[in-house]
């Protein structure tokens, strides 16, 4: 019985050891499919791609919708590859978005109940060693205001600092409420360099700079919703049940 319990614990604590961080044929297929579907459904525009440094680097973005990773992928080149760090995702075998991203190797799951921190850190290091891009939604959960950021989780730039790679701020504007052919903008800011950051105070200051960099890319005011919003169900199509409940529960 004890042997079975140990085996179950090993399975429960597994991490993303087999994560592929190369631009594989499978990833190219995912990139092409996502790009085609997202651009069919929405009018997605990108700005600031010229700010991207040579990889590896870390992308820090706001988070308004379950569509956000795919919206970003739809406007960036197939190389360098973006791998998303998903600390809030408890089960990548459930939900359409999670299954698609997990199948194509597009996310690093990290949940304290399921994944060891060591294996997650190893996976992140693999992304940087392969000269890839690590994407993080630093708020840790979905927010519902276009012009505001939630508080960033502590250590949003910890991986970048540890590896000495730059951070690129990213703002996804227009994904809070979605409908057919809705315009969504993916904005990238100038890179923030981390190689000279030392000590806790410097890391806290870096986190503040990154948050300010993302905030500077957001609109000044909340948008007004039009009366006609065809296929408005797209808003919550890829959101989890908890996020849908929060959206519908009252003030944002």
Which residues are covered by each model-predicted region?
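Helix-to-loop junction immediately C-terminal to a conserved catalytic motif
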Residues: 26-27, 33-63
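Catalytic core of membrane glycerolipid acyltransferases/transacylases, capturing the structured
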Residues: 53-114
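A generic secondary-structure micro-motif detector
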Residues: 23-24, 45, 87-88, 113-114, ...
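A structural micro-motif
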Residues: 42, 80-82, 105, 132, ...
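Alpha-helical membrane-targeting segments
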Residues: 18-41, 93-105, 178-181, 238-242
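Non-catalytic C-terminal accessory region of glycerolipid acyltransferases
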Residues: 2-26, 55, 118-252
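A generic structural signal for well-ordered alpha-helical segments
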Residues: 37, 77, 101-102, 127, ...
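Structural motif corresponding to alpha-helix initiation and N-cap regions
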Residues: 46, 93-95, 118-121
């Amino acid at each position: 019985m004890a042997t079975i319990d140990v085996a179950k614990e090993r399975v429960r604590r597994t991490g993303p050891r087999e994560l592929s961080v190369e631009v594989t044929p499978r990833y190219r297929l995912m990139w092409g499919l996502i790009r085609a579907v997202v651009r069919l459904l929405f009018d997605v525009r990108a700005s600031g791609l010229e700010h991207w440094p040579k990889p590896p680097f870390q992308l820090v973005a706001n988070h308004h919708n379950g569509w956000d990773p795919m919206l970003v992928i739809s406007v960036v080149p197939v190389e360098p590859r973006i791998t998303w760090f998903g600390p809030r995702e408890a089960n990548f075998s459930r939900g359409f978005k999670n299954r698609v991203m997990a199948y194509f190797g597009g996310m690093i799951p990290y949940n304290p109940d399921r994944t060891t921190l060591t294996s997650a850190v190893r996976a992140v290091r693999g992304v940087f060693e392969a000269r890839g891009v690590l994407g993080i939604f630093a708020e840790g959960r979905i927010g519902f205001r276009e012009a505001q950021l939630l508080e960033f989780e502590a250590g949003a730039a910890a991986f970048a600092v540890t590896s000495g790679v730059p951070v690129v701020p990213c703002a996804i504007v227009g994904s809070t409420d979605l409908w057919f052919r809705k315009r969504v903008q993916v904005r990238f800011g100038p890179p923030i360099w981390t190689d000279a950051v030392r000590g806790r105070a410097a890391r806290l200051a870096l986190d503040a700079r990154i948050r300010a960099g993302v905030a500077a890319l957001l609109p000044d005011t909340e948008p007004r919703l039009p009366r006609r919003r065809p296929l408005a169900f797209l808003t919550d199509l890829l959101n989890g049940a908890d996020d849908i409940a929060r959206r519908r529960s009252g003030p944002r």
